[in-house]
């Protein structure tokens, strides 16, 4: 079977309901040369058809990236498969979810495992890695520029104290932000962070490639920081947006209180979801004035169809 570089293969997770133990969620990535990405995609697809797994894995010539969820056996199976494929230096983190965090299992074939749109060499040139303790010491300094490399809606859910929001909607916009806003700071200490670490592999590589002198990033990203840092020692404020059914997590990588507006994708605090502007799957205070009544009617129809499908599965 042949796949184009933009092919997406979807496989419905074979088990709709999970055991009472809940779902193990594994976030992983590694930059590593993959000689035949399409072949790896197909073999992954063959594997996930046989186990109880949901989520997304992205395969490219530069490596693998993704988040998957399943029972303990399924997670161990996919983890061992990737180790056997030579991904033995993965940035790998586990957490848990009481509910199924993804609807489907997707194996995507792309040009990049995280899309920056600018050629960089994260296997050869990256910033200085810092563990949580070192990170706290660095970002407490006055001579450090702290940048959140994530998107605007992620920043909204929570960030590190004093972090700059580049106001990007996608990671592709980050190189333009660097060009416009950071060029004059090449001699400054730059500290960057993201959810799991992968975007900073590329963003720090980009800055070093552009001539920045001192570039640092949080090893393992926010998720590792929240896993290892006690709340009373933490410089994190709010919750960390995640791309699954949990919406956001907090210290200990426990599910947070934010929910997602399924009309616009923005995270909402309990106070925001209690406002009259919020209608599940239809609107929130951030998008209610950005859609027409016809669009809202379509969203309501979609929600009715989703609810009917759920009732049918019960």
From Swiss-Prot:
This is tRNA uridine(34) hydroxylase. InterPro entries: Rhodanese-like_dom, Rhodanese-like_dom_sf, TrhO, TRHO_N. One of its GO terms (biological process) is tRNA modification. Keywords: Oxidoreductase, tRNA processing. The lineage of its organism: Bacteria, Pseudomonadati, Pseudomonadota, Gammaproteobacteria, Moraxellales. Residues 140-234 form the Rhodanese domain. The active site is at residue 194. One of its GO terms (molecular function) is oxidoreductase activity, acting on paired donors, with incorporation or reduction of molecular oxygen. It comes from the Bacteria. SMART domains: RHOD (SM00450). The gene is trhO.
């Amino acid at each position: 079977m042949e796949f184009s570089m933009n092919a997406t293969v979807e496989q419905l997770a074979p088990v709709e309901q999970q055991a009472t133990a809940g779902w193990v969620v594994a976030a992983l990535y590694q930059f590593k040369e993959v000689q035949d990405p399409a072949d790896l995609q197909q073999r992954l697809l063959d594997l996930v058809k046989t186990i109880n797994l949901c989520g997304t894995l992205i395969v490219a010539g530069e490596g693998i990236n993704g988040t998957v969820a399943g029972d303990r056996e399924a997670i161990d199976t996919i983890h061992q498969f990737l180790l056997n494929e030579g991904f033995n230096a993965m940035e790998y983190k586990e957490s848990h979810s009481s509910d199924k965090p993804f609807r489907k299992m997707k194996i995507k074939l792309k040009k990049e495992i995280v899309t920056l749109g600018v050629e960089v060499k994260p296997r050869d040139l990256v910033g200085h890695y810092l563990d949580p303790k070192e990170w706290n010491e660095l970002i407490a300094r006055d001579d450090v520029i702290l940048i959140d490399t994530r998107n605007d809606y992620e920043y909204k859910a929570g960030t590190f104290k004093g972090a700059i929001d580049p106001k990007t909607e996608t990671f592709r916009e980050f190189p333009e932000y660097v060009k416009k806003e950071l060029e004059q700071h090449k001699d400054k200490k730059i500290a960057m962070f993201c959810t799991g670490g992968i975007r900073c592999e590329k963003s720090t590589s980009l800055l070093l490639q552009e001539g920045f002198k001192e570039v640092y990033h949080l090893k393992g990203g926010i998720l590792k920081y929240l896993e290892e840092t006690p709340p009373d020692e933490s410089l994190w404020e709010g919750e960390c947006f995640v791309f699954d059914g949990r919406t956001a997590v907090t210290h200990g990588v426990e599910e947070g209180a934010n929910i997602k507006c399924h009309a616009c994708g923005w995270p909402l605090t309990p106070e925001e979801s209690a406002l009259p502007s919020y209608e599940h799957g239809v609107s929130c205070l951030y998008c209610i004035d950005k859609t027409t009544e016809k669009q809202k009617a379509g969203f309501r129809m979609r929600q009715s169809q989703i609810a009917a499908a759920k009732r049918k599965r019960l």
